[in-house]
Design a protein with these regions (language model features):
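S-adenosylmethionine
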Residues: 1-273
Length: 273
C-alpha cells in the first residue's frame, strides 16, 4: 500500500504489524516516506558546545536527548568543512548518539567499547573521560578497526587503545577490569531498513536467530570483563524482541548477579520498549 512495502519482505511486515498493533504499525510504515534527520556531535575534547555554536557555519538545532548533538539541514555538507578535518565534530545519526550518552562514564573510568567501529560511540565515550582513565575500543573486523583508529586519532583521543579481537580473547587479559562496558551489538539491523534498504538482504540471508546466538556469545565473554559493581549498556539497531529483550533475558537468567537498572527518559517522547 506504500512504496516501502516494495522492498520489505512480507514476513517482516507481518511480524512488525503483530508487534506494534495497527496504530503504531501505520505510523511505522509512514516513517519510510518521511525525511531522514541528519546529525553531528560536537567533540568536547576539542571545543565546548557553546564555543562551537558561536563559530558554526551551519544552521543547527539541538538534539533533545543529547548534551552535544545537533541536527543539520540536508543542504549542508559538514563532511567537507575544515572543522570536520580538525576533529571538531563527528557526523552521526541522531539516534546512534543515544548509547554513549546513556552510559554513565566518568573521568578516570576504565571503559570498553566491545563492538566499536567505526567509532561514533567510542569517540563520545572518550570525550566523557576527558583524557582521564582509559578506553579500549575493539572491533572483530580488522578493516573496520582501521577506520575506528582513524576516527579516534581525528578526534584527538589520547587515552584509547584500538584492538581487533573476538571478545572471548579479551578475557585472558582483562577479566574483571572495566568499570563501564558498551555492547552495541551486531544485529539484524531492522532499524536501518529505511536508511539502508540493502540491510534487508542481510536480514533475509541470516535471520534473527543468527544474530541472537552471536549476541549471546558476546554477552558470555563481556560479563567476565566487568568489575564487580560495574555497568554494562546493551544496545542494538533492531526491533527484534529476540535480540533485545531476549538477549537481556538470557543475561539475567545465566548471570543472576546482574540486575536491570532503570534509565530515566532523556526526552519525554523518547520512549523505551
Amino acid at each position: 500500500r506504500r512504496i516501502c512495502t516494495l522492498y520489505l519482505p512480507e514476513s517482516y511486515v507481518n511480524r512488525m504489524k503483530e508487534l506494534l498493533g495497527d496504530e503504531e504499525f501505520d505510523a511505522y510504515m509512514q516513517s519510510f516516506e518521511e525525511k531522514n534527520y541528519r546529525g553531528l556531535r560536537v567533540n568536547t575534547l576539542k571545543i565546548s558546545t557553546e564555543e562551537f555554536e558561536k563559530i558554526s557555519p551551519f544552521a543547527l538545532k539541538k538534539i533533545p536527548w543529547t548534551d552535544n548533538g545537533y541536527y543539520y539541514e540536508d543542504s549542508e555538507q559538514p563532511a567537507k568543512h575544515p572543522y570536520y578535518y580538525a576533529g571538531l565534530y563527528y557526523i552521526q545519526e541522531p539516534s546512534a548518539m543515544t548509547p554513549a550518552q546513556l552510559l554513565p562514564v566518568e573521568p578516570g573510568d576504565k571503559v570498553l567499547d566491545v563492538c566499536a567501529a567505526p567509532g561514533g560511540k567510542s569517540t563520545e565515550l572518550a570525550a566523557k573521560l576527558q583524557g582521564e582513565g582509559m578506553l579500549l575500543s575493539n572491533d572483530i573486523s580488522n578493516s573496520r578497526a582501521k577506520a575506528l583508529l582513524k576516527n579516534i586519532e581525528l578526534m584527538g583521543v589520547k587515552n584509547a587503545y584500538v584492538v581487533s579481537e573476538v571478545p572471548e580473547n579479551l578475557v585472558s587479559r582483562f577479566a574483571g577490569f572495566f568499570d563501564k562496558i558498551l555492547i552495541d551489538a551486531p544485529c539484524s539491523g531492522e532499524g536501518m531498513f529505511r536508511k539502508e534498504p540493502s540491510m534487508v538482504k542481510s536480514w533475509e540471508e541470516h535471520g534473527v536467530e543468527f544474530f541472537q546466538n552471536l549476541q549471546r556469545g558476546i554477552i558470555d565473554s563481556v560479563v567476565k570483563l566487568l568489575k564487580p559493581g560495574g555497568k554494562i549498556l546493551y544496545s542494538t539497531c533492531t526491533f527484534s524482541p529476540e535480540e533485545d529483550e531476549g538477549s537481556m533475558k538470557y543475561l539475567l537468567e545465566n548471570y543472576p548477579e546482574f540486575q536491570v537498572e532503570k534509565i530515566d527518559s532523556l526526552w519525554q517522547e523518547f520512549a523505551g520498549g
